[in-house]
């Protein structure tokens, strides 16, 4: 128990520090609420949200997804500090009213043991992480690409200073408490429920124990109180902000962008984000929840290929700017505008246009921050307000506006891909069991047409009653939306929703994950609620029900997970299950499933030249596939997305590798035709007006050196082998009694004319 003078001083000090800390937390709340209202539901199903927040926080499940050793040491600090909320309260009371743990029986002994052991673990955890960050060489060190825009406070090493302050506080706080507990043991004798304190007790004598007890009390509790004033500005605030992020997490899949109200008639329309206050308030909460662990940067395909974008730097820059506003322009908390645009301190325009919207940063973030959504809002402002649009995107926009497709090919040619096949439109077959959403790529791009033709031949073979919209179908607007042109997206989407609501499809199947995501998930925001599947999911059901049977091939096959099929929509098993019956040798890429590496096409990147970097994203991914397939005689890289296929096909030197890049549907058709005796002929699309595809690199070396950025190379450990899939019966519509489909033409497939587009050359780095 404290002497009377110490009690009075402690109460005065506590009152002052709690007042300062409370004011700091209130101002922090005001800064976060300076953001605009969010269009997403954040607090519906509150019981489920609270349960999710508690479970995710207490299990540290998202933290342990990556870096298991670092996460292990971090858990020492987390669990120790969580328990220290109780320890500090009990210790504070003990300074005024003696608390006898022995009188509490088993509960007291358990409490004493946990307080003692966790004190030791916290100290071990802090020392380990300090050594890792500041002394041990690591490719995950806290560093950024030279192209990345960094806040002036980052360049002034304030992040390092903050880390040192927080580490010193934890060491002093917990160390003081441990010494105070050890001094008590030195007087009372060894305790079995306090092994760490007993070990330290040999440093003290009964004569100096009281002074060390007083020091321990003030050192432990005084440091906590003193830290309250700094706490709202430090990185340690994430210990409170992370549970709030879990509580307010979006309840839609990551592929669904937030809705935007298009008020073009307003005097000053607010479309997208120009400044901090234009971001929705959860985006500002992101900045304070950020752990600054750089895991998002580790997996970002733009960062991995030497580009200016770092999702980690984006969040850190936001937080530092918010803290600067708190110190120098407090009016921001009361509605005053911030002085600087986001592109002046958060990220550069080059970085804003480098994002592929692959969602890897969202998947890996321990606190569920969403830097991708910041970038989308910045693009919205740049496109719809500032008019700053990459030239090549303007060409794609014009195509979508005039011809309903980004290639700009005449809309009347939308059904030309189906020449010679038994494909009926909804005008001819108004109530099909399946509506095949063809998409722009399969309608106009020769490579993607092979997928569409293979898929409809499989549907015919299985006797599925299907139809397409034909010329009633237009671009979903996915690329326009991810490029920031929400207005164009709504024009296209509204037209499609009106068409689909009139058709009333029972089931929509798409071969393009981007179309699947837009029609199945994003159209719900504008009145379009449909059941949509990826073609691999539907084909898996046809195989499982016995309506399709395939022979097993001899090729060695690996599979590339498309971002919008896998991470954004959670479809991983269906394509793998099909491949496992098509080949006896299916190998996984090192970066697979939710950890898959982007092909580089998403986020409207397909329609523009990549931003400056050390290599193309698709080249990085293709190199990984080449390594996985090794020296096999027959090698196949399977895909489930037309854009992935085109990007990976464009890799320089691919022809020398003899790697065939095929959609899963193409491979399944080969197996089905082989089993039925039709040979391995796959009917390709007829000659048509060619669509410009992706750039073909002509001068890059075959083995470009990856940027020295964390996790540019695949992990050394291979993914575990998965059990071979055995088809099970699935409930599918029975074949209709419609007239037998016309036989598939057996004419030899014409070779697709070469795709021509200007070569890509890395731009000079501007320092």
Predicted regions and their residues:
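Hydrophobic alpha-helical membrane-insertion segments
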Residues: 75-86, 164-185
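Juxtamembrane/interface segments at transmembrane-helix termini
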Residues: 21-41, 94-98, 128-145, 179-192, ...
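Ferredoxin-type iron-sulfur electron-transfer modules and their immediate structural context
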Residues: 212, 228-355
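Iron-sulfur cluster-binding electron-transfer modules in prokaryotic oxidoreductases
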Residues: 203-208, 258-269, 371-751, 755-766
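Iron-sulfur-cluster electron-transfer modules
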Residues: 2-135, 278-287, 309-315, 322-518, ...
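Membrane-interfacial helical/loop segments at transmembrane boundaries in membrane proteins
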Residues: 93-110, 143-154, 182-212
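Juxtamembrane inter-helical linkers in multi-pass membrane proteins
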Residues: 32-57, 137-158, 192-202, 240-270, ...
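Alpha-helical membrane-embedded segments
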Residues: 13-21, 122-126, 171, 210-247
């Amino acid at each position: 128990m404290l002497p009377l003078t110490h009690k009075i001083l402690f109460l005065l000090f506590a009152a002052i520090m709690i007042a300062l800390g409370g004011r700091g937390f209130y101002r922090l709340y005001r800064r976060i609420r300076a953001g605009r209202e969010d269009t997403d539901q954040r607090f519906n199903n509150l019981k489920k949200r609270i349960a999710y927040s508690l479970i995710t926080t207490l299990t540290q499940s998202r933290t342990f997804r990556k870096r298991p050793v670092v996460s292990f040491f971090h858990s020492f600090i987390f669990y120790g500090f969580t328990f220290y909320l109780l320890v500090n309260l009990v210790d504070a009371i003990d300074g005024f009213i003696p608390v006898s743990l022995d009188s509490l029986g088993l509960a007291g002994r358990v409490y004493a043991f946990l307080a003692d052991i966790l004190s030791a673990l916290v100290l071990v955890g802090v020392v380990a992480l300090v050594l890792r960050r500041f002394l041990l060489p690591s490719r995950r060190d806290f560093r950024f690409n030279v192209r990345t825009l960094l806040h002036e406070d980052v360049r002034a090493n304030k992040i390092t200073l903050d880390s040192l302050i927080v580490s010193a506080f934890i060491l002093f706080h917990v160390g003081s408490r441990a010494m105070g507990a050890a001094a008590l043991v030195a007087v009372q004798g060894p305790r079995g429920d306090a092994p760490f304190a007993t070990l330290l007790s040999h440093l003290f004598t009964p004569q100096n124990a009281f002074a060390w007890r007083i020091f321990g009390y003030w050192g432990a509790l005084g440091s906590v109180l003193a830290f309250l004033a700094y706490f709202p500005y430090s990185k340690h605030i994430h210990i409170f902000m992370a549970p709030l992020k879990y509580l307010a997490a979006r309840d839609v899949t990551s592929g669904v962008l937030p809705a935007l109200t298009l008020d073009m008639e307003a005097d000053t329309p607010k479309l997208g984000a120009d400044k901090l206050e234009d971001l929705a308030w959860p985006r500002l909460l992101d900045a304070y929840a950020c752990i600054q662990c750089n895991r998002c940067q580790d997996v970002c395909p733009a960062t991995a290929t030497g580009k200016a974008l770092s999702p980690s730097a984006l969040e850190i820059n936001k937080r530092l700017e918010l803290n600067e506003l708190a110190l120098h322009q407090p009016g921001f908390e009361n509605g005053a505008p911030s002085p600087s645009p986001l592109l002046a301190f958060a990220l550069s325009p080059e970085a804003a246009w480098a994002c592929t919207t692959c969602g890897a940063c969202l998947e890996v973030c321990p606190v569920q921050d969403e830097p991708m959504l910041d970038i989308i809002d910045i693009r919205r402002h740049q496109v719809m307000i500032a008019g700053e649009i990459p030239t090549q995107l303007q060409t794609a926009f014009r195509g979508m506006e005039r011809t309903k497709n980004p290639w700009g090919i005449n809309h009347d040619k939308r059904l030309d891909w189906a020449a010679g096949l038994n494909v009926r439109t909804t005008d001819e077959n108004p109530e099909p069991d399946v509506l095949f959403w063809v998409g722009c790529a399969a309608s106009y791009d020769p490579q993607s047409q092979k997928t569409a033709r293979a898929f409809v031949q499989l549907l015919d073979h299985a006797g599925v009653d299907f139809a397409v919209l034909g010329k009633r179908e237009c671009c979903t607007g996915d690329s326009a939306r991810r490029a920031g042109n929400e207005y164009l997206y709504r024009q296209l989407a509204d037209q499609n929703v009106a068409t689909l609501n009139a058709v009333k499809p029972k089931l929509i199947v798409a071969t393009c994950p981007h179309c699947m995501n837009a029609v199945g998930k994003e159209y719900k925001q504008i009145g379009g609620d449909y059941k949509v599947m990826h073609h691999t999911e539907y084909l898996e059901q046809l195989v499982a029900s016995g309506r399709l049977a395939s022979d097993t091939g001899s090729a060695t096959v690996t599979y590339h997970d498309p971002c919008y099929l896998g991470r954004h929509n959670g479809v991983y098993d269906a394509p793998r299950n099909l491949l496992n019956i098509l080949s006896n040798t299916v190998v996984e890429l090192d970066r697979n499933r939710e950890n898959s590496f982007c092909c580089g096409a998403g986020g409207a990147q397909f329609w523009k030249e990549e931003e400056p970097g050390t290599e193309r994203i698709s080249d990085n991914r293709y190199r990984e596939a080449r390594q996985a397939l090794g020296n096999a005689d027959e090698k196949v890289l399977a895909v489930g997305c037309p854009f992935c296929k085109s990007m990976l096909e464009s890799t320089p030197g691919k022809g020398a590798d003899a790697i065939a890049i095929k959609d899963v549907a193409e491979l399944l058709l080969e197996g089905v035709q082989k089993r039925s005796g039709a040979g391995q002929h796959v009917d390709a699309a007829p000659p048509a007006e060619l669509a410009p595809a992706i750039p073909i690199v002509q001068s890059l070396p075959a083995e470009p050196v990856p940027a020295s950025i964390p996790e540019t190379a695949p992990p050394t450990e291979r993914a575990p082998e998965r059990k071979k899939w055995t088809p099970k019966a699935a409930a599918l519509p029975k074949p209709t009694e419609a007239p037998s489909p016309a036989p598939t033409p057996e004419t030899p497939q014409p070779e697709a004319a070469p795709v021509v587009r200007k070569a890509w050359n890395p731009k000079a780095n501007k320092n």
